[in-house]
Amino acid sequence: MSVETVSDPVPGPGQVLVAPLACGICGSDLHLVESQAAMPDLVPAMVLGHEFVGELLDYGPGTERSFPIGTPVTSVPYLDTGDGPQLVGLSPAVTGGLAERLVLQEKRLLPVSGDIPLRYAAVAEPLAVGVHAVAAADLQPGDAFLVVGCGPVGLSVIACLKAAGLGPVVAADFSPARRALAEQAGADVVVDPALSSPYQSWTQLAGAPVPMSPLMDTPMRANTVVFECVGVPGILATVMDSVPPQTRIVVVGVCQQPDTITPVIGITKELSIRFVFAYRPDEFARALDWIVTGTVDVAPFVTATLPLEAAAEAFDELRQPDKHCKILLLPS
C-alpha cells in the first residue's frame, strides 16, 4: 500500500466530481490489500474506498445540477462508465473514496443533512448491509435474534434490528471491546462464547421448542433467527449444529475460503439458510436517514479518525479487533 499523487478524475456524462471528506475502511479493503501484496501480477492496483461522504465540487456534461455546489453528499458506490458498470473503490477502472477527488453518478447522489458530524455519513454504507440483512430475514412477530460476531457488520445488524423495534437480540463475540460496542448498539444480552453458550441464552429468551420429529402431528414453527456475521470457515456448520429446528439463518459474513457443512443436519432440522449481499439503493437511503435523524447512533462504531496519509497505519491498526471497529480516513 502507498499514498501517491495521481491526476484528478474527470466527470463524464451524468457524473459529478466530489471531494471526499471521510472514507471508512471495510474488511473487503483489508482482503484486497492482502491479495494484491500476495499476487501483484493477478490483482491490479486500485484506489480503494467505498464507504464515503464528500462535498460536491462540479458537474460533468449532461447533468441536471440537482444540488448546489458545496452540498455534502454520499452515494451507493456504483458508477456507470463507457466500459460498463463499475463498483467505486472495488475496481481498478475508477477511483475510490480514499482520495482527494472522486467521481460519482449524479442520479445516485444523496444529500447529507441534519446536525450530525458529516464524517458519520460514511457509515451509511456498512449500516445499509445491516438494513438489507434484516429485511431478508423473513421476520415474524415474536422472533428472537442471535447475532454471531460483533464487528462492523454484526453491529449494523444489531442497530438495525433495534431501530426497527425488534428484539430480543442476543449478541456473541470473543472480543470484550466488541461486546461493549454490541451493548451500545442495543443488544439485550451480550455473551462471551468462551464462558457460556450464546445459543442457550438465546433459546431461553425465544422459548424455542424442544427438538421433535417433523412426522409428529404437532406443527413446528420456530421463532429463532440467527445472523452469522463472522465469515470464516466452520462458523456456519457450528451454527447449524447449535440452533433449534426451523431456525432461519441469515449469512451476512463474507467467507472467502472453501467451507463444509453437513446437509443432513439442515434437512432434519428443516433449517432455512439465506445468503445476503450488500443492499438495495432504498436500503442505503434508509440507513443514511437513520444516521442523520439520530435513530441509529454510529459514533461508537468509529473508533479512530486519521488523515489519508496515515492509510497504511490505519490498515494495520484495523487488524486488531480488540482495539478498533471502524476507522475513518479524512482525505480533505
What are the language-model segments listed below?
Residues 59, 126, 149-152, 254:
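Glycine-rich Rossmann-fold phosphate-binding loop(s) that bind the pyrophosphate
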Residues 166, 230-293, 331-332:
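Glycine-rich phosphate-binding loop and adjacent beta-alpha segment
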Residues 51, 71-72, 101, 132, ...:
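Residue-level marker of beta-strand positions
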